[in-house]
Every structure is written in C-alpha cells, then in structure tokens.
Amino acid sequence: MVPAFEGAGAVEGLTIWRIENFEVVPYPKEKYGQFYQGDSYIVLYTRDVNGNLSWDLHFWLGSETSQDEAGTAAIKTVELDDQLGGVPVQHREVEGHETSLFLSRFKKGVRYLKGGVASGFHHVDPDAPYPARLFHVKGRRNIRIRQVEVGVGSMNKGDCFILDCGSQVYAYMGPSSRKMDRLKAIQAANPVRADDHAGKAKVIVIDETASGSEAGESSPGLGGGSPDDVADEDTGVDDSAFERSEVNVVTLHHIFEDGDGVIQTNMIGEKPLLQSMLDSGDCFLLDTGVGVYVWIGSGSSKKEKVKSMELAAGYMEKKGYPTYTNVQRVVEKAEPAVFKAYFKTWREPQEQIGLGRVFTQRQMSAVSATETDFDVSSLHAEKRRLLQKNAGPAFALCPIMVLARRNLGPLRTLKLEPVDESTHGFFFGGDSYVLKYIYEVNGNERYILYFWQGCASSQDEKASSAIHTVRLDNELCGKAVQVRVVQGYEPAHFLRIFKGRMVIFLGGKASGFKNVHDHDTYDVDGTRLFRVRGTCDFDTRAIQQTEVAGSLNSDDVFVLETPGKTYLWIGKGASEEEKAMGEKVVELVSPGRDMVTVAEGEEDDDFWGGLGGKGDYQTARDLDRPLLYPRLFHCTISPAGCLRVNEMSDFAQEDLNEDDVMVLDSGDEVYVWVGQGSDDQEKEKAFTMAENYIKTDPTERTLDATVILRINQGEEPAAFTSIFPAWNPDMWQKGLVSYDDMKAQVPETNAAVE
C-alpha cells in the first residue's frame, strides 16, 4: 500500500495528493483548490450515504504536466481504487475541462497557477515584490480562475478578470458581464488577497462606476493600455465542451483478454443499447460522443480492470478526441444514473423500480400533501409498473383539485374558440387545445396553462397553441405554469382534471369530423376501437385506434365497438384494475349497449371481422425504464446556434440564477425556469432551449414523450420546489448577497489594511 494512502476514505470529506518525483505526497489543506499547471493530482471525495461510505476518485492533469507524471497519477489512482474495494467511480480530469462534479468540490473555485514541482515553483512570500499576475474568471457556480498572460490582449469585455499587483488586487468587470459573474469575481479576488498576500492587499473594483484614476492605476500593471483597449465580448468556442449535438453516435465496445493474455476491444452495438449487452465477466467502453465511460464487470480479470482506463486513453487517441475528453470508470451494480440513462432499458432490483424518476422523502411529502390518495413509496413493484405505464408523466405536478376550475378552447383557424363544458374531456387528434386551470394555495389563485397538441394537428396549429399560451400567461402577469402536452403523453394532473371522462378521437375538424356532439355516433362503418389507459376513476382515458388487429397489445385492455356488439378485450398482461377501467370506458364511448368480455386467445370470428381479420400485434411487455435522478443545467445558445449546457452538480436553490434561463430535468418532466433578469431573447427561446436539450439527450426519451413546463421566478409550484434539498420562497427578496452588497463591503475590508 502507498504510505500516503493509509486511512484514505475512512471519513467524509475531501483529500488531495500531488505527484512529486513519481511519489504520492499529501497536499496541504490550505492550498485545496489551487492547482499548478505543471503537476498531476489525485482527489478523493468521501461521503456517507445512510451509514455507508461511497467514493468519487478523480485524477487531475495539468496542461503542462509530463506524460510520466500523468501516468503515475493514473496508476496510483487504480491502486487507491483497489484499496477501497474497487467500487469508487473514477474520473479523469483535465485542466480547463473538469467535470461539474469535480468543480463542485471547491466552493471558492479552482485556481490554476503557473509552474509545478518539476519547474521548481516556490511558495509566495507575501512581503516580497513580484511581477503582476492576471487571472481570467470563468463560471457562475463552478468558478475557474486561470492565470493568463498579463496584458489587455488577454482580456475581453464580456468576462471578469483579476489583476494581482501585490499591494493592490484589481477586479475588472467587463461592461458586458452579468451581475452574477461580477459577484463571483469579487469572491475570487478575496482569496488572492487572503492567501497570497496574508490579507495585506487592497481589492479595487473596476466597473462602470469606477473613477478614472482607479481605472488608470491598473494600467501600469497591465503593461500599458486602458480599459478602452480591451476587446469586445468573447464569442469564441472555448465552451465547446459544453455544446451538445443531435448527431452524436452512442456506441458500446467490448474490452476483453484473449487466449494469449492480450487485451482486445471491438464495437458490439450502437444506440439503442440494451443492458443485456453488458457481461459481468468482462469490461466495456461506452462512447457517448461527448465523453467515455469504462464499465467494470464484477467477474472481469485484474488485468482487464487495470488496463481498461489505459485502453480508454488509446481509444480516444485513435478516434482523434481532444485530450480533455472526460473519462469515467464505473463498476457493475454501482452505476450512476447518468450511465444507465444511455440504455434503452435497465432492470433495477424490484424495490428500486420507479416511474422514471428518483424521489427523496421530501419530494414524496410534497406529492402526498396535494394528492393524499397517492403514495408511491407504499406500492408493490407491479403496482408501480402499472403507474409507470398508465398514470401519465409528471405525476408530482398534482395541485389540489378542490375548488379548481378550468377553461378549455381548441384552435379553429388558428384562433381560440371556447369548448362547451359538457364536452370537456373530448379531444381530437387533428386539433390543438389550450386549457387554463385555476386553483388556490393559501387563499391565492394559482394557474396552470396547458397547450395540448394532437398528433395530426398542423404545425401552424401547434405553433399557435404555444403563442396563445404565452399571451394568456402575459395577461396573468407571468404567474402561470406553462405546460406543453403532446397527445399520448398527458401529465397525470391533466388526466385527473377530467375525472375519468377523457376520450381522444382520431381526426379533427380538418379531418372531416361532423362535430364533437356526434362523438358517440359518427363513424362511416359503425366500427371503432379504443385503447384503455388508467389506474383509477380519475385518470382513465380512451384513445381511439385504427380498427386493425395490429393496434392490439397483450399488455392492455381495448374496447371494440361494431354495428352489432361492443367487445371488452382483455390482454393477457392486463391487470384487474385495467379491466375495471375498461368497463367504465364502455359506458362512456358505447353507452346503452350490452358488453361482451373477451379474453385474449378466445376471440370469435365476429371480433376479428370487426378488425378486418386476424393479424400480428405486440405481445411483449415493455421493460422498465432506468431510474433518472434530477439534474440542473444552465443552458445558453451559442453565437453559432449550438446549445451550451453546463450542469450544476449537487444543486441547490442558490444555483437558480436570476439573470438566466435554467433547465431542471427531474428525470420525468423537464422544467424551464425563467429568471426575472433574463433577457428578452432568452425568455422567447425558453421552450426552444428545453426542446433542444431533449433532442440532444442521449437517452431514449423523445421530444413528444417528454412533458415540458415553463415557470417564472417566484411562481414555482410544489412539484418543482420539492426537487431541491431546501426551498426558501423569500430567498430572492432578502436571502442572497447581491453584487452591489458585495461591492459595498470592499472599502470596509480595505480600511482594515491601512
């Protein structure tokens, strides 16, 4: 065992080692967060989860580190991994392109310093004169502080910079930078003063309010020039690592040891991938297009385990990937949710099967507070499977139904027309609708605006439904939650609004239907087929299908109405609850007629005649979806039109930036949170950002199958706030330190230096 690793990982917290002359040396805690560009480091994060320790193991490579040092860091990381039982998740980190998880370990940010062990660096003497240093501050939550060449040529007006001149530390705020960037810049300047100058330097803020003399004082430190000489906002591609593409190909590669003891690799599949492709006896490499995972089977050989990361490096070199491409090593039965999400199906232990989303106890409490008859945690696995299949997505969004009211209108010639209340719940696949739902919370009215888009609705109608929804929200002063609903993927609350009386018919006005009042009689041949979905009286719905055998599914219940009979067809995989819901649907779509119950396999000729004859149909049960954990992203559109995604690991409410649009992926639904300070273009493109996020999502989710909700700052529903570890509704009014507050504290701190 490496002596420096003795006792490693036994207690919670962060531990860092540096590679010095090919040896592992403990790194001083007071220097955590400072990394020399010429060095390599090993970073271990230990946490206690319900009494069990778990580990994330990172090895960090500076941009100027030697190949030998980098190799030593990788080898020693494997040794530490073995010491911890081979279960840590390993991460390869490269300077400037670290994972958000790594950056989140350092609350004051990460600072890159020139030099290293091999170059003979020395500790800073706070009383000794030394040349000026310029730092580029990037990131709003995960801060990177990179040392750059001193001079105005290294600066731009869209970012913030720190100029360290010894007795003065200047914080330059680019005119185009945002308030959150500026706040982080001051926070980054304070450690430079405290750590490098023993608190004896003054911090001087250079922004639009700075005097000419203050701005001029920094010019000598920059080697001449003035703020006017600084380049415009950077529009380069330095954030390309965060850009997501729709065309990334996800591939799976087998890593194995052949009969001669030589490690081999070969590609075994492309997306869609199945969990069954992974063999416990071997190792596998998953190439996601933006990063690489190495999966270690529990029965793989020691050589395969040791060589797998080395092979990953060779694979990336062969593919021409950048050296900073993220690599993670995961072990069987301890796969993170992000890894499992790349597979179309993933069998979890029965007690872990969920609705596609992982819930904390706090989130469960928020759900049960609004819908007391629904408690997922108490359900048997088979019941949870039925809920996953029938209850509809976004089931956490279930506000209290009491005293609620609704207004429904379809789009006719791209205009909203009211729907007669007696026909609420009847939808046509050729139309789009807007539904306004009003409910009360603590005596105050709250609103949800649904825009429902039929599968056969025209693109103009779909676009118009979104426009009308925005208009209605504006009339409500931005207080509504906007929810896009695609036919067949209605959220649980949307279904419950109609209390079991929802029917989706084929066609629409443009398709030649007479009108909605003829729904129970109009059909050219007197034959109609409906698929039944639902778990209780409140969420049952009937979806009309094409009258052919191929529309049937063994996992479901169907209602077949013919001129002479009405059949209730029970698939072999259907539950008793689904059968009961089917009987209620018969009363709804085919009232006043005798019902004939037919079990799958016992159909008569008249039944098949109504479907145009026997035919093949789906008989296999859909497999379980992998559990997905909530994730928060800061999303922007780059000047080139690409989606830039920056994930916030271990996120909290404080990560919701007032100046930005954020995307919260709950694992079930996707929320678009619009900050009050976001610009008009970002507000206008909020839904587009979420749609692009889903399109570039490497999992099997599709745009149509994912519910998108748009919410404004200050109007967050309980389903949204419950995803966060804690929520303070007054935070933005009095809970956060603003840039102006932080700036006002600077003179007070400087006064103590004099």
Curated annotation (Swiss-Prot):
Gene3D superfamilies per UniProt: Severin
Reported function: Calcium-regulated, actin-modulating protein that binds to the plus (or barbed) ends of actin monomers or filaments, preventing monomer exchange (end-blocking or capping). It can promote the assembly of monomers into filaments (nucleation) as well as sever filaments already formed.
Gene Ontology CC annotations of this record: actin cytoskeleton; cytoplasm
Protein name (database record): Gelsolin, cytoplasmic
Gene Ontology terms, MF aspect: actin filament binding; metal ion binding; phosphatidylinositol-4,5-bisphosphate binding
Protein residues bound to Ca(2+) 3: 659-660, 682
Gelsolin-like repeats by residue range: 22-71, 143-183, 266-306, 414-463, 538-580, 643-684
